[in-house]
Every structure is written in C-alpha cells, then in structure tokens.
A protein has these predicted regions:
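Conserved helicase motor core of P-loop NTPases
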Residues: 1, 6-178, 184-186
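C-terminal accessory regions
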Residues: 171-172, 179-304
Length: 304
C-alpha cells in the first residue's frame, strides 16, 4: 500500500497536538517540493517568501493591481481597524465586498477585532435589509460558514415567497456540507433556514432531529443543524486554511499574540488571489510575523 500526503508544512499546525508534516519530513520520508505558484503573484508571493525565510515582508502603502508585477500586499495602519475596514468595504468597486472578500481574524472572541465582533458589525453593514424571523440568528442574504461536517436534506423551491423556508420542498436526497464551506442564507422560517451552496440548496433545521425509538433506528440521516453554522463575514485564520478569495483583509490584532505567529501570517496572507490588505496595529504585525511556535512543538512521531 502506498500513501501520498499533500500539504504545506509551513502552514498552521493542527489545532490539537502534533506537527505531522514537519515530523514526516524530519524522519526522512521521500518528498518533493512544488515550486510553481498558481494562486497568486506579485508582492503577495514575495511577502510570503520573506515570512517563510524568517524576514519581515515589504508592505506597500498603496495597491497597483494592474501592474505586470502587481503591488497587492498592503498594510493600512489604524487605531480603529473595524472603522477602517468599513470604509474600505464601502468604497470597494473591484471586488464584491461580501462574496469576493474575506475578513480574517486571529481569535473567536474576547477582542475588539475578534470573529464575533467582526460578524456583529458587518452583518449590519453588509446585509441591513435581510428578512428576519424572531429566534433565528441569521437573515436572508447572510454569508455563513459551516463549522462541522453535516449531511443535510436537499431541497428545491416550490412556489410563492423565495425568502420563506416553508416554500422549499425536499428532493428526496441528501447533500454533504463540509466544515469550512461558505454559503448564503436563501430563505428563513421559525423552524430553520435554507442555505445555498453554489447550485445546491439544503435545509438546515433549527435543532438536530431526535433519534427514533422504534425499529432500532439511530434517527434521520440528517446530521446538521443551525448550531453547526455561524456568520461568515469574518472567520479565523485557522478556519481559512485550505480556502482562497480574490481579496483578503487580515486584522492585525494585539490580542491575537497567542495565535498569530509566523505560520499564521504566512497562511492568512497566502489565502489572497489578487489583493491582501492588512489592517490594524503595525507593531503587532511586526512582532507576530517573526515569532515561531511550530518549531517548539514537542512530538515523538520521528522516534516511532
């Protein structure tokens, strides 16, 4: 049996224990290194290379995205980062501020620049008129992210009000939604929401179905519920790993020091295809981008 592992050992380590890619390389497992960059170009690539080498990247004070060698990595120093991000989003013309742009945060909560703070603010800014129902935290049109692998009922629109989740009928099939998938709230009701993932529509119940007591059944095949989804205007850098967007806004947060290190910044900046804007405290960025934590993880895989 042959096994092929694909990954970047310089990106974020597992949230829990271990550093498997680092240890496999250290153990001398045969490996290759891909050199051609496909996702991005310009100063994003040079900045990531500098971070990887342990150097401080060069950050521009302006963008030039149309140049042959685009200037597409910029730092906007700000004492009120969310105010600055709001101004950027309202003035944005090249990229859709919701679906082509992603805000990345260091921490989930307990910071003015946390994921919770970002989503509370930018839901109001970017989706002020979305239809709401009491008891449901989302509104029609909201950007949401899946936080746990889920199997959900596939649905199709019947007739009537497209924003009413009760107007959607099951197709008889199921649809798998992976942890990290980003979708749009298409319809809403007191019992749940309809989410759109590309051409797929799924029903997300307000609560998980209860197991059936008869016939030894373990319950419905549906495994997801609204608790497995969160607003997605802002997500953490860890949740962003493996994804990409045309424009990425990364918040330089002094409160993110325990999370935002050299590997975190390398990962978040490299999520951007066309433009990456860092907003916030310059000194926090400069300290964090040179701090190493992955190399200090104590593991024993190489000794096995």
């Amino acid at each position: 049996t042959q096994i092929l592992f694909v990954g970047d050992p310089f990106q974020l380590a597992p949230v829990g224990h271990g550093a498997p890619l680092r240890d496999l390389l250290a153990a001398g497992v045969p490996n290759g290194d891909l050199k051609e960059v496909r996702r991005n170009a310009g100063s994003i690539v040079r900045g990531c290379a500098a971070i990887k080498a342990g150097d401080r990247p060069t950050l521009a004070d302006r963008f030039d995205l149309d140049a042959d060698d685009p200037i597409n990595l910029r730092l906007l120093e700000s004492h009120d980062a969310l105010d600055s991000v709001e101004q950027v989003l309202l003035a944005m013309s090249r990229f859709d501020p919701v679906w082509q742009t992603q805000i990345l945060c260091a921490v989930n909560e307990k910071s003015d620049l946390s994921r919770a703070a970002v989503n509370e603010r930018f839901q109001k800014l970017l989706n002020p008129e979305g239809r709401r129902v009491p008891g449901i935290p989302f509104a029609c049109g909201d950007k949401v992210i899946c936080t746990s692998n889920s199997t959900l009922s596939a649905v199709e629109f019947g007739a009537g009000d497209e924003t009413d989740a009760g107007r959607y009928q099951p197709t008889g099939g199921e649809s798998f939604v992976a942890n990290g998938d980003i979708g749009k709230v298409k319809a809403i009701s007191s019992t749940g929401i309809i989410l759109e993932f590309g051409e797929r529509l799924v029903r997300v119940p307000k609560s998980k179905p209860k197991a059936k007591a008869d016939e030894g059944s373990e319950g419905d095949i549906v495994s997801g519920a609204m608790g497995d989804f969160e607003l997605g205007y802002g997500i953490t850098g860890h949740k962003s790993q493996g994804s990409q967007w045309p424009c990425v806004i990364v918040l330089a947060d002094k409160s993110g020091g325990s999370v935002a290190d050299r590997n975190w910044w390398y990962t978040t900046i490299s999520r951007a295809e066309k433009a990456c804007l860092i907003v916030g405290d310059r000194s926090a960025f400069e300290q964090q981008v040179r701090r190493e934590t992955l190399t200090r993880r104590k593991t024993f895989l190489t000794e096995l």
